[in-house]
Amino acid sequence: MASPAFSHFLPRFGVAAAVASALSLAGCQSWNTQDTLPPTSGVQPLKGLAQNVSVRRNAVGVPLIESSSFHDALFTLGYVHASDRIGQMVTLHLLAQGRLAEMSGADALEVDRLMRAINLKKSADELYKASSPRIKRFFEVYARGVNAYLFRYRDKLPPDLAAQGYTPEYWKAEDSALIFCLLNFGQSANLQEEINALVLAQKVGSDKLPWLTPSYPDEPLPLAEADKLKGLNLTVPGLNEVSRAINRLAQLNSLGTRGGSNLAIAPQRSRTGRSLLAADSHLQAWYYTQIRAPKYQAAGASIAGLPAILQGFNGKVAWSMSSVEGDNQDLFLEKLKRQGNALYYQNNGKWQPVTVRNETYFVKGQRPIREAVYETRHGPLLNSALGAALGNGFGLALQTPELKDDKTLDAFFDLSRAQNVEKASDASREIRAIALNMVFADASNIGWQVTGRFPNRREGEGLLPSPGWDGRYDWDGYADPMLHPYDQDPPQGWIATANQRVISQGYGMQLSNSWHAPERAERMAGLASSGKQDNRSLIALQYDQSTLFAAKLKKMFEAPGMAQPLKQAIEALPDTERAKAREAYSRLLAFDGKVSAGSADAALYELFLQESAKQIFLDKLGPESSDAWQAFVANGNLSYSAQADHLLGQEDSPFWDDSRTAQKEDKPAILARSLAAAISSGEQLLGADRKAWQWGKLHSYQWTNANGRQIRGPLQAGGDHNTINSAAYRWGQDFAITDTPALRLIVDFSLSEPLMGLNSSGQSGNPVSPNYANGIDGWLKAQYLSLPMQPQNFERSYGKTRLTLVPGK
């Protein structure tokens, strides 16, 4: 599978291939690689089926499963998931358990140590045990379908997976709960940000840290939150190792991208008088599927390893999900001391022994390694797991919600069967194990529900690590689900989410302080409010590449307290730089905010953003190779950034002064330098003819296979981190695209067949499959495919060719 956003994406489906540098397809197998493809026609007996099942596929390989029982449909879903995505399933399963080194070798060991400490298996066990007998039975049947594939094809695995020499284990029902917990972990905030904040605090101190960790444009800086760290020696053993492991995990976990959006249009805003729903997700792991069985039909996006359609349409209700950026991960600094061989931590003035559990790592090509993981009352000590020799100093404990008595897995199934918005809302309220914006619609109504489990903190905001020895920062249970934000049929006639802050200041519960920037959501709101909508306008919205940040930047340039000082600062530059700054200033004032691939002004605008970050922060956080700079850039991608916050305000920030010069600089002086630097950088990268510049020549889509070989591209890309059609890059590092909306779906209730969608990465992870990376053209051209619900329309979309699965003996 390949992605339009990542030149390194395929290994995130077969992550072991990336870690182990998988062999080239040419000559790496002794058998015909076509044998690794299960048939798509004919008759195939499978032990475990009760009755015959039909599987048809559409032009891009989306399966339609037709069965006489829901159990047989789930069995077949397991078989089909494994047929197309066994590499994804195996590697994410190993990643979630902290066992990737068994397949990939020692290079994966640091991530394994981190995942063993986090211990998702404990969460998965809690979640599975709390599920109803009905759901457990569904998961068991699904697992048998996966194992039917493994039994038949374990010696004919896809070539990139087979190259690892690893024999996959048979699937267990509990493994699906583990995949769900990995998804939950990836969609949670803000562990990575807290780790990065500590790295930054080591560089600049806790007094300057608030300027680097803003929450939102209209929120005050987190000064009180940073006061928790005042006076502490923040030299934490193993911190940089934890930081690198967390960042590596983020690269490997294809369930960890939090970007996405939802939009529901009420009948009064629709041209046809019927509701519409549109959604996109930046997760690269989605797999479209359709199930038709007695008393159950649904089509939409699933994740291989999970027997569920997580967002889609069932003939009556459409539902979608995106990250709400909920903060349910807290880091605690623990005071430690060692006495002999025993390790203790301080709790409200008293020393208590840590809990110890032993973990054994089976590393490919090496002897087993046995290590201890230490835990406090808050959770596992991450730096102990990464090999830091803990003595008298700080440990880093991670606390996450417990999932005992959690009915989330039942709730997702109930949601997929809901027949109206009211029932969808009821089901969504029971989703507690994962923090999401759930948006849903039927023909006449729309709704929204925030799901999840959010801690009640006695003090603090959870944005930065807390002193674990001080009970003032402990959790007191979880927020009452009745306080979770929701809405139904709002008077404005639309609901839009794009990872922005979804609650007002002073709301009655702590949801998060790690929101994404507001511009994507603001653009969606503006488009949704402008006249009547239909499916064509929603397609245009999903491909929109206009940024509202450019207008805010212009407003800042022309503000009463900035306009004259900025012009003076430009005039004070040396002659050559002055001319460049003047040109950049005038062109940015005229820029219309359309970040199209062929735009010269868009290129200049993005160059200015990049250069301003370096001019403002690099003197204190650099060099660019330093851990501090890498942490700063990473946090800029995870939530509302200090880069944006300083451009739009923060005139009194200590970061405006360039510590490398004798004089004291202010904001106008640094902005003037940044304007000139944008032109200079553009000349180096794009040439001297500045009118011929093109944003897409700096910023492109590329597709590569598991070996790093280019499949397609580079193709010029428009957009950036603030456009609805997102094409984010590392602000302060380079213009390489980090994520885009991989999956898109639209449901138009005025149509006889309401659901249409596309998936950029293609259905299959097997490089020899015709459905490998075959979503690229449709994604580029906005060619949505219909997924019909009425049997008389199946042949038009899925054709006549079918694979008939029959009970085996």
Curated annotation (Swiss-Prot):
Keywords, in A-Z order: Hydrolase, Periplasm, Quorum sensing, Signal, Zymogen
GO cellular component: periplasmic space
Domain of life of the source: Bacteria
PANTHER family reported for this sequence: ACYL-HOMOSERINE LACTONE ACYLASE QUIP (PTHR34218:SF4), PEPTIDASE S45 PENICILLIN AMIDASE (PTHR34218)
Subunit architecture: Heterodimer of an alpha subunit and a beta subunit processed from the same precursor.
Family: Belongs to the peptidase S45 family.
Protein name per UniProt: Acyl-homoserine lactone acylase QuiP
Organism: Pseudomonas fluorescens (strain ATCC BAA-477 / NRRL B-23932 / Pf-5)
Lineage: Bacteria, Pseudomonadati, Pseudomonadota, Gammaproteobacteria, Pseudomonadales
